[in-house]
């Protein structure tokens, strides 16, 4: 019945990455042949036009391109794609890698994940990536400002 369907949707499955849009969005092909856009759950990377936006994309690209990642759907479709937790073949959490390298903000409105808080704090303390720019603004604020233009 309906419940059974929901369980199937939440199961993780492998995806072959074919392109990377920005620091938290990639396009991949699932085994069934469906090409979908995926958005990494619980982080927000700088937009391409923001400081470090290009670097964030490049970092994600280096982690995932031409590789398979396991994705686990989290809360459905967003305008940016299917929201997923993504793990690499080495079992690294993509969101955690992005936070730890200073290429994403942690969206604490999504999940209370101590590991993510620690990784973001590490990057802040090291002053790396987005944290090298004292005047950086969170992408969700940036999008608001630029939507008006």
What are the functions of these language-model segments?
Residues 1-149:
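Small beta-barrel nucleic-acid-binding modules, primarily SNase/OB-fold domains
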